[in-house]
A protein has these predicted regions:
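FAD-dinucleotide binding site
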Residues: 3-484
């Protein structure tokens, strides 16, 4: 669980607790009130449906978590709106006159001996490396291997003398691995396939809610923005962990949802929006009868990774707020680290969040992000400050931070990861996401258990706009007159 958790927005919880022997009945129950769940709840409530949202955490938002920090807010989860056109998330902000700003950051490169790296060269090589992702090979292969081959050919043609500097090449490739992993949430860029259906939206890819916070999206979705009244037919119950979903074949029977606190609820249908990480852990016990084998296979073969953040607050900013700062190690400096310090080499750099003027975010991913969640707070703080001073402290005195936050997306039992990516099994299971999205039907062909969430979107998985699209998709499946 989060060691710091906040309620993202005020949600009216209507009705009195119901004894387990007398289940409450709704049109639709939504399990998980993240971006997909809140979008589905909003869509159905606007249509007059009686909806119950069950959320295991003590807040709505799911893998979006806006936290008050210092002189503003920071995002422990999703940071940006990725693209503008067409984006349900961006449109909602604009329609409600919420300021959304592009985060255009220049950068300065730092090496582990405190020297400055060649910014122009790194920009050229990084731009090329990220660009070849859009030019995949005919036969799919691990993304890291493909980028490495293409980059080496590029360097051989355009910067042949660099090939003599093995230390630079090795550490450049390790840095690019971290950059890809932070995009994908993977542990290694060789866990990612060159074959993907992911499609970027048009427009700026890093639009920030800045001081408004991503929490504003959920206030808009639930009609509580600017003290809105909410929806009269929507109930949201927090701290409600679902233990079992019993779905019938009989068209006249209800779906029954049981919670760990003994309460039970009934509905015509259920929309399940929990993360792939939760499905992986609980699919055997959560559904009765159990899921069909093809859906189980999709859950097993898809991958969810972890992106971790450590956010430091200082008395005042001592860095250029218009830049992010990549860290590239030198091999000799790495060799001097002890085995229990090696995890610090997994941070790709630091960047300033837009919702706060005195904070820096350090980014990690994969197994190291999982490890950082479990280490004592004082150890994390001490080691990341040693890292920051090693790279950025040459010729200056960097003060101690006055506060620290860190994410815990893997250790949180209600998320078990950050977001999904297309792994190297993707070519063998190209329809895994579509299969995961298929509803479970009763004997009449009516959908009884529906599935939403970023993992179920073929082209916009891993994003908030992808998650919201799936929530709208499944709500629309229950509203035949809706326009998809």
């Amino acid at each position: 669980m989060f060691w710091l958790s906040v309620v993202l927005c005020a949600v009216a919880v209507r009705g009195n607790p119901t004894p387990a022997t007398m289940p409450e009945s709704y049109d639709t129950i939504i399990i998980g009130m993240g971006a997909a769940g809140c979008t589905a709840a909003s869509t159905l409530s606007k249509a007059g449906k009686r909806v119950l949202g069950l959320e295991a955490m003590d807040r709505v938002g799911g893998r979006v978590n806006t936290v008050p920090f210092g002189d503003g807010v920071v995002e422990l989860g999703a940071e940006w709106i990725h693209g503008q056109f067409p984006s349900r998330v961006y449109d909602l902000a604009i329609q409600n006159n919420v300021s959304i700003l592009p985060q255009d950051l220049d950068f300065d490169v730092y090496r582990s001996d405190g020297s400055s790296g060649d910014k122009q060269l790194l920009n050229e090589l990084m731009t090329f490396s990220l660009g070849v992702v859009d030019d995949p090979p005919q036969v799919p292969e691990p993304l890291g291997e493909y980028i490495t081959k293409r980059l080496m050919d590029y360097i051989k043609t355009n910067h042949p003398t660099l090939l003599q500097d093995k230390d630079f090449i090795d550490n450049l490739l390790e840095f690019l691995d971290l950059v890809i992993d932070n995009y994908e949430s993977s542990n290694s860029w060789n866990d990612v396939s060159t074959e993907t259906r992911y499609t970027e939206l048009d427009g700026h890819q890093h639009m920030s809610w800045h001081r408004n916070g991503y929490k504003t999206l959920f206030q808009i979705l639930l009609n509580t923005y600017k003290n809105g009244p909410g929806y009269p037919t929507l109930d949201i119950k927090l701290k409600k962990e679902v233990s079992q979903i019993s779905w019938p074949q009989d068209p006249n029977a209800d779906v029954v949802v049981s919670c760990t606190d003994g309460t039970t609820y009934r509905a015509k249908n259920v929309i399940v929006t929990v993360s792939l990480g939760v499905l992986k852990e609980r699919y055997n016990t959560l559904f009765r009868p159990q899921l069909p084998q093809q859906k189980v296979t999709s859950i097993q073969k898809l991958s969810i990774g972890v992106v971790g953040k450590v956010i430091l607050e200082f008395e005042k900013a001592w860095w250029d707020k218009t830049k992010w700062f990549p860290f590239i190690w030198k091999s000799d400096d790495k060799k001097r680290l002890s085995d229990d310090e090696e995890w610090v080499t997994n941070f790709s750099g630091v960047s300033p969040p837009m919702g706060n003027s005195k904070s820096l975010t350090l980014w990690s991913c994969g197994e190291v992000a999982k490890l950082v969640e479990t280490l004592p707070e004082d150890v994390v703080k001490r080691k990341v400050m040693e890292l920051v001073r090693r790279f950025m402290g040459k010729g200056k005195t960097i003060p101690e931070p006055i506060a620290m936050l860190r994410s815990s997306w893997f250790s949180n039992p209600y998320t078990r990861g950050s977001y999904t990516y297309d792994n190297i099994l993707t070519p063998q299971y190209p329809n895994a996401r579509a299969t995961l999205a298929e509803p479970l039907l009763d004997s009449s062909g009516a959908p009884r258990v529906l599935f939403a969430g970023e993992a179920t979107d073929n082209t916009h998985f891993s994003t908030v706009h992808g998650a919201t699209d799936t929530g709208f998709r499944e709500a629309s499946r229950l509203l035949p007159t809706a326009k998809l």
